[in-house]
Amino acid sequence: DRPVCRLEDMKGLKIRVQVASMMGDTVEALGAEAVPIAYAELYTALESGTIDGAENPPVSYYYNKFYKVAPYYVKDRHTYTPGVILVSKITWKNLEKEYQDALVQAAKETQEYNRTAIEEADQKAYEALEKEGVTILEPEDPQAWSQAMEPVYRKYGGEYLDLIEKIRQIR
């Protein structure tokens, strides 16, 4: 029940994470305690004080009514969840080339549409959350948050460290 704008504000908070070591390491790098809890138990865990916060896209936060038990939302942009199309190697090999080409083309054509649709849905969710009385915050010093993530980048970045650096330079 307190706002989080500075990296120091994370200290001592219990943050729900998925049962995945990278997410736990991410939360701990920010100074909080990572608490693995099933998504189905998230509302109750917030309500009871078992945890102090969790990560959620704005649409999920709104539709699951987490704002009733967690009145602050921090737009920290710590992750981007892409939509992906997966096809097994066996299935792909069994498709005729024209169908493979059609699937690849359809995926390319829907990329921008999906990004735009997600951005619009997020914006509508933010507006609805503000109407519900949610305080929407942004980190005061995003660079400090990013620097705190260095150990996580090194641990999990592996062969992608150069790509991570290129992305940083673009920002």
Where are these regions (language model features)?
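N-terminal secretory/targeting leader peptides
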Residues: 1-171
